[in-house]
Amino acid sequence: MAMAMANHHTLGLIFGILGNIISFLVYFAPAPTFYRIYKRKSAEGFHSLPYIVALFSAMLWLYYALLKKDAFLLITINSFGCAIESFYILLYFFYAPMQAKKQTLKVVISLNVGVFSILVVLIQFLLKGSNRINVFGWICASFSVAVFAAPLSIVAKVIRTKSVEFMPFSLSFFLTLSAIMWFAYGLLKNDPCVAIPNILGVILGLVQMVLYGFYRNAGKEKMEKKLPEHIIDMVMLSTLGTSDIHPIGAQQNGIKKSGSEDVKDDEETGNREKSTENSGELQPNGSTV
């Protein structure tokens, strides 16, 4: 019996460490997007809401981990999550237009300060002991389910357009892997609040990867037909991890016919940067325990 418990504890520790490592990588997924913002000295065309929501999620799970005993691995990853999402938001705020700054400030004050403070005060004064942990744990789980379910709009978009252009395989793979690790951790630690939301994460991740395999060739054929006609500048505007594609400018392919190598190089560089932005903004850590 003691040996079985020791094995459970060891396995839980292993899965928790692996979950931390993979979640660290996922948290860095938007880094190319913010490097692009830094280089442009402008955040115009981008939204801060996905990162505000990711910060709120990390704050919830961090507080839950502090209420529990023996939750060091939850504390480490969500402390890091709070730090890096705060950095992303500050960088966005620094380079955003004035109207976007005002909107970002309103949401941060309302959600990350207001709602979070109300939840903490209610939990601290209305509940005690294990009830406090259980109730707040299910609040965290419910929020994670909502965030995991949000990318269903991406799945619908892939099916509708038969294109996986805006659903990068690598990001879907690492999010699925992260969900598997945290599901196993929650199961071994007998923590349903951690395990249950990640069941949905695993299922959704597998669906995304299957769709990627099914539609990737169709997407390439469509892109080959479209590319000679237009060069479209797009940004991914995400809400709770969902993505909508908004064209903010289009040029005919022959708009600059100087024939210079610089123009061609600029277009190729732009396409690569846009591809980086798409993978960085698609699902910016919608969930992480």
UniProtKB/Swiss-Prot annotation:
Keywords: Cell membrane, Membrane, Repeat, Sugar transport, Transmembrane, Transmembrane helix, Transport. Its main location: membrane. Residues 14-100, 136-219 form the MtN3/slv domain. It is a multi-pass membrane protein. Pfam families: MtN3_slv. Gene3D superfamilies: 1.20.1280.290. One of its GO terms (biological process) is seed maturation. Residues 1-10, 67-70, 128-134, 189-193 are extracellular. GO terms for cellular component: Golgi membrane; membrane; plasma membrane. Residues 277-289 have a biased composition (Polar residues). The keyword Cell membrane applies. It comes from the Eukaryota. The chain crosses the membrane at residues 11-31, 46-66, 71-91, 107-127, 135-155, 168-188, 194-214. GO terms for molecular function: sucrose transmembrane transporter activity; sugar transmembrane transporter activity. Residues 249-289 are annotated as: Disordered. Residues 32-45, 92-106, 156-167, 215-289 are cytoplasmic. Mediates both low-affinity uptake and efflux of sugar across the plasma membrane. Belongs to the SWEET sugar transporter family. Forms homooligomers and/or heterooligomers. This is Bidirectional sugar transporter SWEET15. It comes from Vitis vinifera (Grape). The gene is SWEET15.
